[in-house]
Regions:
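Ligand/cofactor-recognition surfaces for anionic moieties
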Residues: 1-449
């Protein structure tokens, strides 16, 4: 057999003691579906989507195997009562529209295998909304990573991007309100009602000018590069970002319907993290009445994500069926004692030497340390009251100075698929580049960070 894709409905992990799985033998991508043990009506009304047991069996453990979660396909309903047994057993009942979503989602991934030049949307975050932090991503230089992805995936000439950050603040691509209104017919009626109840007239949307939506975006070859629109108003951005209850505005909804209307082959969200996976809806096993499902549609989503944030990466995997590609964090630099704290550190060292050997000198040093710590504001920062025990105060001051001296911090930002600092990172850089190319070809990627 040479399948182009595998849809797996078995639960738990599919790996043996040697770490291999028969599902991986053909090197085809494996899509995991969930069979809920709840009744259909209970699933429809459940905010969590799946029970803890179903989540573990059908999502979490297959996720560790590297399966792409494609959605829920069935829940349970009582069968016809057996009159002899006086018992009606529960049977799995297909959820037809969710099966259709799984099929279309898998079809789009398969289509990538036969597309030499996929139309790819590269999406950059706008959080936290300051001009100097455009395209923010945790630990990732998203602007330079965008250039690298354009080059590595053969989407266009990265040099033609010029000053990408500046261009994204000045250039726009448009979509008419008329086309948007027509596309809204594809949005489930419940979501349609929520949208207009929350945001009213389309013409009043912040992204609408002269009868069209103005998206911060530009086209380069097969790549569409865009800033992810605001979920709501800029002034409420911080509150909106992780809010699972706020309905997105017309401009946000229009952006993703626009991508669907252009038959986008793949979407690459560059870096942790965006807002699509945080829209209202179920936590997992989404229905068609969940905003992430309606806006992501069946477009394959590839998501370079920092490896040390698996919790938020799981949100993208489970709510928008994203394939996350782990990237290494920036290198760590060693901190040092600030100049203003050097005299305090010296006094603490002297105190350690005098303690137990010269009580009079020790007491003088103790007073000097307290006085200096107070003048530097250290005691205030640590909440040390004036009447606190001297020994406790010195212990806390010493621990504070040591923590500062021994701390490590991120030095710069990582560029996806590149080695931008000293050290042998060639394996990680190669893995990132290869993972991106493989994903855009619709092929299987082995599990890993």
């Amino acid at each position: 057999l040479k399948p182009v894709a595998i849809v797996n409905a078995t639960s738990f992990s599919g790996r043996g003691v040697d770490g291999t799985s028969p599902l991986d033998a053909t090197n085809a991508p494996v899509f995991q579906v969930a069979l809920s043990t709840a009744r259909v009506k209970d699933w429809k009304g459940a905010e969590r989507g799946l029970s803890p047991a179903d989540l573990a069996m059908h999502v979490v453990l297959p996720e560790v195997d590297g399966r792409l979660f494609a959605g829920i396909v069935s829940a349970k309903e009582p069968a016809k009562k057996d009159q002899d047994l006086e018992y009606a057993r529960f049977e799995h009942t297909p959820i037809v529209d969710r099966i259709d979503r799984v099929v279309s989602r898998v079809d789009k991934w398969i289509a990538l295998q036969n597309t030499s030049a996929p139309k790819t949307a590269l999406i950059l975050s706008t959080y936290p909304g300051k001009a100097y932090q455009i395209a923010h991503a945790v630990g990732l230089d998203a602007i330079q990573s965008c250039r690298a992805i354009v080059e590595d995936a053969g989407l266009g000439d990265p040099d033609a991007l010029g000053d990408l950050g500046q261009r994204l603040q000045t250039e726009v691509l448009t979509w008419s309100v008329a086309d948007y209104t027509a596309a809204l017919d594809t949005v489930p009626s419940d979501l349609h009602a929520q949208l207009f109840e929350a945001w009213g007239d389309i013409a009043q949307d912040q992204y609408v000018q002269n009868g069209a939506f103005q998206f911060p975006a530009l086209q380069l070859g097969n790549a569409l590069i865009a800033l992810q629109p605001e979920r709501g108003w800029l002034k409420t951005r911080y509150d909106d970002y992780h809010d699972l209850s706020r309905t997105p505005c017309h401009g946000y909804v229009a952006f993703y319907l626009w991508l669907q209307s252009m038959n986008t082959d793949a979407m690459v969200h560059i870096g942790a993290h965006g807002t699509l996976e945080w829209l209202p809806g179920k936590s997992v096993a989404l229905s068609n009445a969940c905003w992430p499902d309606a806006l992501a549609g069946d477009i394959p989503i590839i998501y370079p994500f920092i490896v040390n944030d698996p919790g938020e990466a799981a949100q993208a995997k489970r709510r928008i069926s994203a394939l996350t590609l782990g990237h290494i964090p920036p290198p760590l630099a060693q901190s040092h004692t600030p100049d203003a704290f050097v005299p305090l550190e010296n006094l603490l060292d002297e105190f350690s030497n005098a303690d137990g050997l010269d009580p009079k000198r020790r007491d003088r040093l103790m007073d000097q340390i307290r006085d200096l710590a107070q003048s530097l504001g250290v005691e205030q920062d640590l909440g040390i009251a004036g009447d606190v025990d001297q020994g406790e105060a010195l212990t806390r001051i010493d621990r504070f100075v040591c923590d500062i001296k021994e701390a490590q911090f991120a030095d710069g930002l990582h560029v996806f698929g590149r080695m931008g600092y000293e050290g042998d990172q060639s394996l990680a850089a190669h893995s990132e580049r290869d993972g991106l190319r493989t994903a855009l070809c619709g092929r299987r990627i082995a599990s890993g960070p």
